[in-house]
Amino acid sequence: FQPGCNCLIGKDFRRWHGACDGSVVGSDKESGMARTFYDEMYDASGNCRPHYREFARWLAETPEELLAQRRREADLLFHRAGITFTLYGDEQGTERLIPFDTIPRAIPMSEWRVVERGCIQRVKALNLFLADLYHEQRIIKAGIIPAEQVLANEGYQIAMQGLDLHRDIYAHIAGVDLVRDGDGTYYVLEDNLRTPSGVSYMLEDRKMMMRLFPELFAAQRVAPIDHYPNLLLETLKSSSPLDNPSVVVLTPGRFNSAYFEHAFLAREMGVELVEGADLFVRDDRVFMRTTSGPQPVDVIYRRLDDAFLDPLAFNPESMLGVPGLLAAYRSGNVVLANAIGTGVADDKSVYPYVGDMIRFYLDEEPILRNVPTWQCRKPEELSHVLAHLPELVVKETQGSGGYGMLVGPAATAAEIEAFRERLKARPDAYIAQPTLCLSTCPTFVEKGIAPRHIDLRPFVLSGRETRLVPGGLTRVALREGSLVVNSSQGGGTKDTWIVED
């Protein structure tokens, strides 16, 4: 251990993690959340957790130079494969390689089963909420969610009112962001129901680990995830009432931040990747332009925001969408996955009500907890937030990617005061939460191995049934002390292992 660098050199990381795991960093009596860091690999006594023992043994026996060589090889292979994302506003170039860490995040199967059941329960309730919101609005009439909270929401689409969808599914693909608090409890940080991204990195990270370290997978049973594209295609086909519907992936184009993923998923599913200009609508039917003439399209896996889907119905300046698409959709001649208007359910101002949705629609208690949340639109909660800004994380209700937020403990006094004025000017645009003690996982950094904060995004598919592959995208905040894991903010990824207990 080198003083001052907060990292480890060589194999001495076990002793360091044992000493640091569970160190108290404060308390939060109001939220009831633990204020310690949970280390995924080591317990508070410094002992390796059982599901990591095989990996820890391998890591201790593997020469450091070989590990470094494999990490360099991973970077080279990711570059060659074009596994990048686009960083908007970057003056030095738009395409970036997402840093990949070769120490996996491992989860025992018994623990995963709870996460799986909780994600399925949550997405089922969210789909029921969307079906209810765009029809009878029973949850509003019951006084559980205020009407203005959803009907005046930017994500609510009046064009969806009264429209019946096959199987009543709105969010066919959902990403549920999970974090683990200091006592090991999983919390849902947010739901992603519009165009959730990141699954391609989950799949490519696994391919990379199997290529670089096949001996690890021979020594330990890790649940497979490579069947995800097949499950996704089954889900998309089941969203249509037709026996064998034609499916396409609609992308905004190669300058979109997730274009690699759009192309990757289309290729893996064996379907066409199209842009808006490749499609047209005739007699309320969608067709794809091909060299063999127009071909009908039945299901569109759209990776395009609502506002850009149809210039005749939404943003008239959109050059990315398909004129007449909404009319075809409302006529029942094409399926959009995800449905238009799903954004109202993953809005951060609606997030506090998801537990109530589970109780209302499923008559069950939530398996996964929400993070305690203050709604700044409520005067009494705004007063609390303004009085405790240095301690809280404040987010825009429509924000994403780690932008437009304040992390109080990491902000300067000037930044806090500037944010205070923004908050007072538009309180309804913000929510606040306690600063989470995200769990840590050993991670390769420049000078060795050090703990870095992580989250987890499992991907939930809703078709004939609701299901997940055993895994997800683990994102890691690579900067020391950072709690922001988003790739747009310098975060990286890890392979996620679901292992036998």
Give each language-model segment a name.
Residues C5, D12, G18-D21, V25-D501:
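Preference for protein termini
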